[in-house]
Amino acid sequence: MQSWSAPAIPVVPGRGPALRLFDSADRQVRPVTPGPTATMYVCGITPYDATHLGHAATYLTFDLVHRLWLDAGHTVQYVQNVTDVDDPLFERAERDGIDWRTLGDRETQLFREDMAALRVLPPHDYVAATDAIAEVVEMVEKLLASGAAYIVEDAEYPDVYFRADATAQFGYESGYDRDTMLTLFAERGGDPDRPGKSDQLDALLWRAERPGEPSWPSPFGRGRPGWHVECSAIALTRIGTGLDIQGGGSDLIFPHHEYSAAHAESVTGERRFARHYVHTGMIGWDGHKMSKSRGNLVLVSQLRAQGVDPSAIRLGLFSGHYREDRFWSNEVLDEANARLARWRSATALPEAPDATDVIARVRQYLADDLDTPKALAALDGWCTDALSYGGHDTESPRLVATTVDALLGVDL
Protein backbone atom coordinates (compact mmCIF):
# COMPACT_ATOMS: atom_id res chain seq x y z
CA MET A 1 0.00 0.00 0.00
CA GLN A 2 1.38 3.42 -0.93
CA SER A 3 2.01 5.84 1.93
CA TRP A 4 2.73 9.53 1.22
CA SER A 5 5.61 11.68 0.04
CA ALA A 6 8.41 12.38 2.48
CA PRO A 7 9.50 15.93 3.27
CA ALA A 8 13.17 16.77 2.87
CA ILE A 9 14.99 16.60 6.21
CA PRO A 10 17.97 18.92 6.67
CA VAL A 11 20.96 17.72 8.67
CA VAL A 12 21.79 19.40 11.96
CA PRO A 13 25.54 19.58 12.69
CA GLY A 14 26.66 17.02 15.26
CA ARG A 15 24.58 14.13 16.52
CA GLY A 16 21.63 13.94 18.86
CA PRO A 17 21.70 12.15 22.24
CA ALA A 18 20.17 8.76 22.95
CA LEU A 19 16.40 8.78 23.36
CA ARG A 20 14.62 8.08 26.65
CA LEU A 21 10.88 7.35 26.68
CA PHE A 22 8.20 6.40 29.17
CA ASP A 23 7.41 2.71 28.85
CA SER A 24 3.80 1.93 29.72
CA ALA A 25 4.69 -1.62 30.74
CA ASP A 26 7.48 -0.65 33.15
CA ARG A 27 5.74 2.60 34.21
CA GLN A 28 8.94 4.62 33.98
CA VAL A 29 11.08 6.67 31.64
CA ARG A 30 14.05 4.62 30.51
CA PRO A 31 16.53 4.54 27.60
CA VAL A 32 15.46 3.27 24.21
CA THR A 33 18.29 1.04 23.03
CA PRO A 34 17.99 0.23 19.33
CA GLY A 35 20.75 -1.17 17.20
CA PRO A 36 21.92 0.57 14.02
CA THR A 37 18.38 0.09 12.67
CA ALA A 38 15.66 1.30 15.03
CA THR A 39 12.28 -0.39 14.64
CA MET A 40 8.83 1.00 15.38
CA TYR A 41 5.28 -0.19 14.81
CA VAL A 42 2.48 2.35 15.23
CA CYS A 43 -1.16 1.35 14.92
CA GLY A 44 -2.88 3.15 12.07
CA ILE A 45 -6.37 4.42 11.43
CA THR A 46 -9.65 2.67 10.83
CA PRO A 47 -10.61 4.71 7.76
CA TYR A 48 -14.28 5.46 8.29
CA ASP A 49 -13.92 9.21 8.89
CA ALA A 50 -11.44 12.05 8.42
CA THR A 51 -8.24 12.63 10.40
CA HIS A 52 -8.90 14.55 13.61
CA LEU A 53 -6.42 16.24 15.93
CA GLY A 54 -6.35 13.22 18.23
CA HIS A 55 -4.97 11.20 15.34
CA ALA A 56 -2.59 13.99 14.43
CA ALA A 57 -1.21 14.22 17.98
CA THR A 58 -0.38 10.51 17.96
CA TYR A 59 1.32 10.45 14.58
CA LEU A 60 3.20 13.68 15.29
CA THR A 61 4.53 12.13 18.49
CA PHE A 62 6.00 9.17 16.65
CA ASP A 63 7.21 11.50 13.92
CA LEU A 64 9.34 13.13 16.62
CA VAL A 65 10.70 9.71 17.57
CA HIS A 66 11.48 9.00 13.92
CA ARG A 67 13.27 12.34 13.50
CA LEU A 68 15.25 11.98 16.73
CA TRP A 69 16.43 8.53 15.75
CA LEU A 70 17.62 9.88 12.40
CA ASP A 71 19.37 12.75 14.19
CA ALA A 72 21.10 10.21 16.45
CA GLY A 73 22.42 8.34 13.40
CA HIS A 74 20.01 5.42 13.18
CA THR A 75 18.34 3.95 10.16
CA VAL A 76 14.62 3.63 10.92
CA GLN A 77 12.29 0.81 9.97
CA TYR A 78 8.83 2.18 10.68
CA VAL A 79 5.69 0.14 10.02
CA GLN A 80 2.10 1.37 10.22
CA ASN A 81 -1.10 -0.47 9.36
CA VAL A 82 -4.53 0.56 8.13
CA THR A 83 -7.44 -1.33 9.70
CA ASP A 84 -9.46 -1.35 6.50
CA VAL A 85 -11.73 -4.22 7.53
CA ASP A 86 -13.61 -3.67 10.79
CA ASP A 87 -17.09 -3.13 12.18
CA PRO A 88 -16.99 0.71 12.38
CA LEU A 89 -16.09 0.88 8.70
CA PHE A 90 -18.97 -1.40 7.71
CA GLU A 91 -21.43 0.46 9.91
CA ARG A 92 -20.49 3.86 8.50
CA ALA A 93 -20.58 2.56 4.92
CA GLU A 94 -24.06 1.13 5.46
CA ARG A 95 -25.25 4.37 7.05
CA ASP A 96 -23.94 6.44 4.14
CA GLY A 97 -25.02 4.01 1.42
CA ILE A 98 -21.50 3.51 0.11
CA ASP A 99 -19.35 0.45 -0.47
CA TRP A 100 -17.03 -0.12 2.50
CA ARG A 101 -14.00 -0.38 0.21
CA THR A 102 -14.81 2.94 -1.45
CA LEU A 103 -15.22 4.60 1.95
CA GLY A 104 -11.97 3.12 3.22
CA ASP A 105 -10.02 4.18 0.13
CA ARG A 106 -11.42 7.71 0.32
CA GLU A 107 -10.61 8.27 3.98
CA THR A 108 -7.19 6.62 3.70
CA GLN A 109 -6.32 9.00 0.87
CA LEU A 110 -7.45 11.97 2.97
CA PHE A 111 -5.28 10.69 5.82
CA ARG A 112 -2.29 10.53 3.47
CA GLU A 113 -2.91 14.10 2.36
CA ASP A 114 -3.19 15.28 5.96
CA MET A 115 0.02 13.52 6.97
CA ALA A 116 1.90 14.95 4.00
CA ALA A 117 0.62 18.45 4.80
CA LEU A 118 1.73 18.04 8.43
CA ARG A 119 5.18 16.97 7.19
CA VAL A 120 5.01 13.61 8.94
CA LEU A 121 7.71 11.23 7.76
CA PRO A 122 6.00 8.26 6.09
CA PRO A 123 6.39 4.69 7.34
CA HIS A 124 8.78 2.33 5.62
CA ASP A 125 5.89 -0.13 5.27
CA TYR A 126 2.28 1.04 5.10
CA VAL A 127 0.14 -2.08 5.24
CA ALA A 128 -3.60 -2.53 4.83
CA ALA A 129 -5.13 -5.31 6.90
CA THR A 130 -6.75 -6.65 3.74
CA ASP A 131 -3.26 -7.05 2.25
CA ALA A 132 -2.11 -9.11 5.23
CA ILE A 133 -4.81 -11.80 5.32
CA ALA A 134 -2.34 -14.58 4.52
CA GLU A 135 -0.08 -13.56 7.40
CA VAL A 136 -3.04 -13.44 9.78
CA VAL A 137 -4.26 -16.88 8.71
CA GLU A 138 -0.78 -18.32 9.22
CA MET A 139 -0.57 -16.81 12.69
CA VAL A 140 -3.99 -18.06 13.72
CA GLU A 141 -3.02 -21.54 12.50
CA LYS A 142 0.05 -21.47 14.75
CA LEU A 143 -1.99 -20.29 17.74
CA LEU A 144 -4.53 -23.07 17.19
CA ALA A 145 -1.81 -25.68 16.82
CA SER A 146 -0.14 -24.62 20.07
CA GLY A 147 -3.39 -24.60 22.03
CA ALA A 148 -3.26 -20.83 22.55
CA ALA A 149 -6.46 -20.52 20.50
CA TYR A 150 -9.65 -22.51 20.02
CA ILE A 151 -12.77 -22.59 17.87
CA VAL A 152 -16.02 -22.00 19.75
CA GLU A 153 -18.67 -24.69 19.50
CA ASP A 154 -21.13 -22.80 17.35
CA ALA A 155 -22.43 -24.51 14.24
CA GLU A 156 -23.50 -21.22 12.67
CA TYR A 157 -20.56 -18.97 13.54
CA PRO A 158 -17.48 -20.99 14.60
CA ASP A 159 -15.30 -18.03 15.56
CA VAL A 160 -11.67 -18.50 16.62
CA TYR A 161 -10.59 -17.09 20.00
CA PHE A 162 -7.27 -16.48 21.72
CA ARG A 163 -6.90 -17.75 25.27
CA ALA A 164 -6.09 -14.81 27.55
CA ASP A 165 -4.13 -17.18 29.80
CA ALA A 166 -2.00 -18.51 26.94
CA THR A 167 0.99 -16.55 28.24
CA ALA A 168 2.00 -16.35 31.89
CA GLN A 169 2.82 -12.66 31.51
CA PHE A 170 -0.56 -11.55 30.10
CA GLY A 171 -1.44 -8.21 31.65
CA TYR A 172 2.10 -6.87 32.04
CA GLU A 173 1.73 -4.28 29.29
CA SER A 174 -1.28 -2.52 30.81
CA GLY A 175 -0.87 -3.46 34.46
CA TYR A 176 -4.67 -3.49 34.82
CA ASP A 177 -6.57 -5.78 37.16
CA ARG A 178 -9.19 -8.19 35.83
CA ASP A 179 -12.17 -5.97 36.62
CA THR A 180 -10.63 -3.04 34.77
CA MET A 181 -9.78 -5.30 31.86
CA LEU A 182 -13.35 -6.59 31.63
CA THR A 183 -14.75 -3.07 31.67
CA LEU A 184 -12.41 -1.80 28.96
CA PHE A 185 -12.74 -5.00 26.93
CA ALA A 186 -16.51 -4.47 26.71
CA GLU A 187 -16.14 -0.76 25.91
CA ARG A 188 -13.45 -1.18 23.25
CA GLY A 189 -14.67 -3.82 20.86
CA GLY A 190 -14.49 -6.95 22.99
CA ASP A 191 -17.27 -9.46 23.55
CA PRO A 192 -17.00 -10.73 27.14
CA ASP A 193 -20.47 -12.28 27.10
CA ARG A 194 -20.14 -14.23 23.84
CA PRO A 195 -21.48 -17.77 24.50
CA GLY A 196 -19.00 -20.61 24.09
CA LYS A 197 -15.88 -18.77 25.20
CA SER A 198 -13.61 -20.35 27.79
CA ASP A 199 -12.96 -17.02 29.50
CA GLN A 200 -14.68 -13.66 29.18
CA LEU A 201 -11.32 -12.07 28.32
CA ASP A 202 -10.58 -14.41 25.43
CA ALA A 203 -10.19 -12.25 22.32
CA LEU A 204 -11.45 -12.77 18.79
CA LEU A 205 -8.82 -13.92 16.30
CA TRP A 206 -10.97 -14.87 13.32
CA ARG A 207 -14.61 -13.93 12.83
CA ALA A 208 -16.51 -16.58 10.92
CA GLU A 209 -18.33 -15.39 7.81
CA ARG A 210 -21.55 -13.45 8.41
CA PRO A 211 -24.14 -12.33 5.86
CA GLY A 212 -23.24 -9.03 4.26
CA GLU A 213 -19.66 -9.01 5.56
CA PRO A 214 -16.46 -9.54 3.56
CA SER A 215 -14.68 -12.82 4.14
CA TRP A 216 -11.60 -14.74 3.06
CA PRO A 217 -10.85 -18.47 2.93
CA SER A 218 -8.86 -20.17 5.70
CA PRO A 219 -8.27 -23.72 6.97
CA PHE A 220 -10.71 -22.92 9.81
CA GLY A 221 -13.43 -21.57 7.55
CA ARG A 222 -14.20 -18.38 5.68
CA GLY A 223 -14.10 -15.22 7.75
CA ARG A 224 -12.09 -12.12 8.52
CA PRO A 225 -9.39 -11.14 11.03
CA GLY A 226 -9.96 -9.89 14.52
CA TRP A 227 -8.55 -6.46 15.27
CA HIS A 228 -5.59 -7.32 17.50
CA VAL A 229 -4.08 -10.13 15.46
CA GLU A 230 -3.78 -7.92 12.37
CA CYS A 231 -1.14 -5.81 14.09
CA SER A 232 0.67 -8.82 15.57
CA ALA A 233 0.94 -10.49 12.18
CA ILE A 234 1.97 -7.35 10.28
CA ALA A 235 4.60 -6.39 12.85
CA LEU A 236 6.14 -9.87 13.03
CA THR A 237 6.31 -10.34 9.27
CA ARG A 238 7.65 -6.83 8.54
CA ILE A 239 9.95 -6.34 11.53
CA GLY A 240 10.21 -9.60 13.46
CA THR A 241 10.95 -10.06 17.14
CA GLY A 242 12.72 -7.48 19.26
CA LEU A 243 10.57 -4.53 18.21
CA ASP A 244 11.98 -1.34 19.74
CA ILE A 245 8.69 0.57 20.04
CA GLN A 246 5.03 -0.39 19.83
CA GLY A 247 3.11 2.87 19.75
CA GLY A 248 -0.36 4.37 19.67
CA GLY A 249 -2.87 6.37 21.67
CA SER A 250 -3.44 5.64 25.36
CA ASP A 251 -6.82 4.13 24.49
CA LEU A 252 -4.91 1.27 22.83
CA ILE A 253 -3.08 0.21 26.00
CA PHE A 254 -5.91 -2.25 26.62
CA PRO A 255 -7.18 -4.29 24.99
CA HIS A 256 -5.41 -3.70 21.68
CA HIS A 257 -1.75 -3.59 22.63
CA GLU A 258 -2.11 -6.13 25.43
CA TYR A 259 -3.54 -8.71 23.03
CA SER A 260 -1.28 -7.82 20.10
CA ALA A 261 1.67 -8.47 22.39
CA ALA A 262 0.19 -11.69 23.78
CA HIS A 263 -0.54 -13.08 20.30
CA ALA A 264 3.03 -12.41 19.17
CA GLU A 265 4.56 -13.75 22.38
CA SER A 266 2.51 -16.94 22.12
CA VAL A 267 3.81 -17.56 18.61
CA THR A 268 7.45 -16.62 19.17
CA GLY A 269 8.02 -17.62 22.77
CA GLU A 270 9.52 -14.20 23.47
CA ARG A 271 8.88 -12.66 26.89
CA ARG A 272 8.16 -9.20 25.44
CA PHE A 273 6.81 -8.31 22.03
CA ALA A 274 8.26 -4.78 22.24
CA ARG A 275 11.04 -3.28 24.31
CA HIS A 276 9.02 -0.09 24.78
CA TYR A 277 5.27 0.44 24.77
CA VAL A 278 4.71 4.14 24.14
CA HIS A 279 1.31 5.83 24.35
CA THR A 280 0.05 9.32 23.68
CA GLY A 281 -2.53 11.28 25.64
CA MET A 282 -5.99 12.10 24.36
CA ILE A 283 -6.87 15.44 22.74
CA GLY A 284 -10.07 17.09 23.88
CA TRP A 285 -12.37 19.83 22.66
CA ASP A 286 -15.06 21.57 24.68
CA GLY A 287 -14.21 19.63 27.82
CA HIS A 288 -14.40 16.15 26.30
CA LYS A 289 -12.10 13.66 24.61
CA MET A 290 -12.14 14.21 20.86
CA SER A 291 -13.76 11.18 19.25
CA LYS A 292 -15.84 10.19 16.25
CA SER A 293 -18.55 8.68 18.42
CA ARG A 294 -18.98 11.94 20.37
CA GLY A 295 -19.02 14.05 17.21
CA ASN A 296 -16.73 16.75 18.61
CA LEU A 297 -13.93 16.37 16.11
CA VAL A 298 -11.57 19.06 14.93
CA LEU A 299 -10.45 17.76 11.55
CA VAL A 300 -7.01 18.41 10.11
CA SER A 301 -8.52 18.79 6.65
CA GLN A 302 -10.96 21.43 7.93
CA LEU A 303 -8.16 23.43 9.51
CA ARG A 304 -6.17 23.22 6.29
CA ALA A 305 -9.21 24.34 4.28
CA GLN A 306 -9.49 27.35 6.60
CA GLY A 307 -5.93 28.30 5.71
CA VAL A 308 -4.32 27.22 8.99
CA ASP A 309 -0.58 26.69 8.55
CA PRO A 310 0.25 23.01 9.22
CA SER A 311 3.33 24.14 11.13
CA ALA A 312 1.02 25.97 13.55
CA ILE A 313 -0.94 22.74 14.05
CA ARG A 314 2.31 20.98 14.93
CA LEU A 315 3.31 23.71 17.36
CA GLY A 316 -0.13 23.78 18.96
CA LEU A 317 -0.04 20.05 19.63
CA PHE A 318 3.59 20.21 20.79
CA SER A 319 2.77 22.92 23.34
CA GLY A 320 1.66 20.16 25.73
CA HIS A 321 3.55 16.99 26.65
CA TYR A 322 2.68 14.01 24.48
CA ARG A 323 1.63 11.81 27.41
CA GLU A 324 -0.80 14.34 28.84
CA ASP A 325 -4.50 14.44 28.06
CA ARG A 326 -4.96 18.00 26.86
CA PHE A 327 -7.42 20.28 25.11
CA TRP A 328 -7.30 22.00 21.75
CA SER A 329 -8.87 25.43 21.54
CA ASN A 330 -8.83 28.61 19.51
CA GLU A 331 -6.46 30.01 22.13
CA VAL A 332 -4.02 27.15 21.59
CA LEU A 333 -4.08 27.81 17.85
CA ASP A 334 -3.66 31.57 18.33
CA GLU A 335 -0.63 31.01 20.56
CA ALA A 336 0.84 28.59 18.02
CA ASN A 337 0.39 31.09 15.19
CA ALA A 338 2.03 33.83 17.26
CA ARG A 339 4.95 31.55 18.16
CA LEU A 340 5.40 30.55 14.52
CA ALA A 341 5.46 34.20 13.44
CA ARG A 342 8.10 35.07 16.10
CA TRP A 343 10.29 32.15 15.12
CA ARG A 344 10.08 33.05 11.45
CA SER A 345 10.95 36.67 12.17
CA ALA A 346 13.95 35.67 14.31
CA THR A 347 15.35 33.16 11.83
CA ALA A 348 14.98 35.68 9.00
CA LEU A 349 17.41 38.08 10.69
CA PRO A 350 20.82 38.53 9.04
CA GLU A 351 22.55 38.12 12.42
CA ALA A 352 21.50 36.69 15.78
CA PRO A 353 22.95 35.30 19.02
CA ASP A 354 25.09 32.17 18.91
CA ALA A 355 22.87 29.08 18.55
CA THR A 356 25.17 26.37 19.92
CA ASP A 357 23.56 26.25 23.36
CA VAL A 358 19.94 26.41 22.22
CA ILE A 359 20.45 23.63 19.67
CA ALA A 360 22.04 21.42 22.33
CA ARG A 361 19.21 22.11 24.77
CA VAL A 362 16.50 21.42 22.18
CA ARG A 363 18.14 18.10 21.39
CA GLN A 364 18.44 17.22 25.06
CA TYR A 365 14.87 18.17 25.96
CA LEU A 366 13.41 16.21 23.07
CA ALA A 367 15.57 13.18 23.86
CA ASP A 368 14.26 13.28 27.44
CA ASP A 369 10.83 11.72 26.86
CA LEU A 370 9.96 14.16 24.06
CA ASP A 371 9.74 17.20 26.32
CA THR A 372 8.37 19.53 23.66
CA PRO A 373 7.21 22.25 26.11
CA LYS A 374 10.81 22.75 27.29
CA ALA A 375 12.16 22.57 23.74
CA LEU A 376 9.68 25.20 22.58
CA ALA A 377 10.49 27.41 25.56
CA ALA A 378 14.21 27.21 24.80
CA LEU A 379 13.58 28.31 21.23
CA ASP A 380 11.27 31.07 22.44
CA GLY A 381 14.09 32.41 24.58
CA TRP A 382 16.58 32.44 21.73
CA CYS A 383 14.08 34.12 19.40
CA THR A 384 13.23 36.77 22.00
CA ASP A 385 16.92 37.57 22.46
CA ALA A 386 17.46 37.69 18.71
CA LEU A 387 14.52 40.03 18.11
CA SER A 388 15.18 42.23 21.15
CA TYR A 389 18.95 42.46 21.26
CA GLY A 390 20.24 41.14 17.94
CA GLY A 391 23.58 39.36 17.70
CA HIS A 392 26.70 38.95 15.62
CA ASP A 393 26.45 35.38 14.33
CA THR A 394 25.48 35.24 10.67
CA GLU A 395 25.05 31.44 10.68
CA SER A 396 22.83 31.06 13.73
CA PRO A 397 19.48 32.01 12.11
CA ARG A 398 19.98 29.31 9.49
CA LEU A 399 21.14 26.76 12.07
CA VAL A 400 18.11 27.35 14.28
CA ALA A 401 15.75 27.08 11.31
CA THR A 402 17.48 23.85 10.29
CA THR A 403 17.12 22.44 13.81
CA VAL A 404 13.44 23.35 14.02
CA ASP A 405 12.83 21.75 10.63
CA ALA A 406 14.83 18.57 11.23
CA LEU A 407 13.74 17.82 14.79
CA LEU A 408 10.30 19.40 15.16
CA GLY A 409 9.19 19.19 11.53
CA VAL A 410 8.23 22.88 11.59
CA ASP A 411 8.89 24.78 8.39
CA LEU A 412 10.23 28.27 9.02
Curated annotation (Swiss-Prot):
'KMSKS' region, short sequence motif: residues: 289-293
Binding residues annotated for Zn(2+), in chain numbering: 43, 231, 256
GO CC, alphabetical: cytosol
Outcome following mutation: residue 46 to V: 100-fold decrease in catalytic turnover
Record GO terms (molecular function): ATP binding; cysteine-glucosaminylinositol ligase activity; cysteine-tRNA ligase activity; zinc ion binding
Keyword match Magnesium: no
Enzyme class, first EC level, given as a word: ligase
Cofactor note: Binds 1 zinc ion per subunit.
GO terms of biological process kind: cysteinyl-tRNA aminoacylation; mycothiol biosynthetic process
Cofactor: Zn(2+)
Protein name in UniProt: L-cysteine:1D-myo-inositol 2-amino-2-deoxy-alpha-D-glucopyranoside ligase
Species of origin: Mycolicibacterium smegmatis (strain ATCC 700084 / mc(2)155)
